[in-house]
Amino acid sequence: GVTVMRTTFIELQTPFMSKIRGRWRAIEPYSEREVLDFPRYGKGGVYWFNTVEALTVADTFPQLKTIITKFGSVPDYYNRLTWLMARLPKAWLKNSALIESLSHISYRMTQVTDPSTGVGIAMRIQIGGQKDGKAATYLATFEHEDTAFCAGCGTGAIAQLILSGQLHKPGVWPVEQALPTSLFEETLAQRQLVIERQE
């Protein structure tokens, strides 16, 4: 809803840090457009965007040299508008009244387009490295017609594992540090969610 829109505009205000070739680098938000293919949605534009995974994945897997977090929307004109917003004077982006107004306008726009474009999600992770001494690439994609359903499944899965006593990790942890892969895959199967993998 409107909170997601506010968060998006807040994230456009300042550069964020990401690990590139083993060094931390400041990245301009919503920059370096790249077109990727998502089977459910076809080709879609994605842009650098600050997500918590830029930090937590680097902490969880320190051997990774480069971590790129990108985001995009369908229809693509939302990407173009967000790109333009990111280029506004920073003082405008830090004007809370303007951000509040734009957040409400943006949310109303999605209410108009969502019936035709849907409210789905597509995620992609690509890992490049070495396997058995040779260059290798691993690609995983996840797509679903309902983003809110998937978010609920994720939250519900963690709650289920804690309440059933299968997950014991006191404190505050990123999911990738708290949840073993075997339990993650088990909860996906229970919810009939599928991650497609290619090696």
Model-derived regions, located:
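C-terminal catalytic/substrate-binding lobe primarily of soluble NAD(P)-dependent oxidoreductases
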Residues: G1-E199
